[in-house]
């Protein structure tokens, strides 16, 4: 099996959703904890970015490989997905498991090179990825679970850097009798979760009939078309609110970018019946959302560090 087939198997283009938020998490943590560091710290801080990317690519590949393995029976029953690698036989289960092991290795090696906290918490995304394919068998909240999986992208990158300073307190919030609260990364991660949830609810419209026939609990299969549209718009407004509340570095760039992309996403959803290819348009606009927000973060003044709220 060649590189092209492997990239198709893991749908490499979907990495464009998570990658900008991985970078956003890294940039926020770097600006918060290391912007004023002396030059002796810069080399290993930049190496952190390399290992974060290795871990992120591994996590993304593992998530998709596990999804394909666990969902192969569902894929076989759906005309849209019946041509996928494991269903069609173009890839063996043995190869799929080997790829999963390689991606897991990338995740663990990247986390190991970062710090103890990153390595010890690597089980969390793995568990989330294993659970996700089963959620659609039992609840229409499966879309939210997928959103939470993607919400780990900025949170994981941020923790990987923050743990170099605060250790386990970057997660627990407890350090030396003080309670640490990091609102910016919390609301950005929550915003990502809601953004992906809104996208996935609309993405699932393609499989409504198949999902109903095969007992798959997607939101559009459970509820009406009108409710699906209304809910996805409400989720879009909620993710905009989360990004607005996060207010990284108190500048207008991020708020403006979030506002622009939320309007674009709502516009596409409302025009669904008038677009020649709603799914492709929604995919492009949703994918662009993360990159526009990343550009906004880059344009901000890095000296305006994100605040950490400390309570005794």
Model-identified regions with their sequence ranges:
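Multi-pass alpha-helical membrane architecture of UbiA-family
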Residues: 1-312
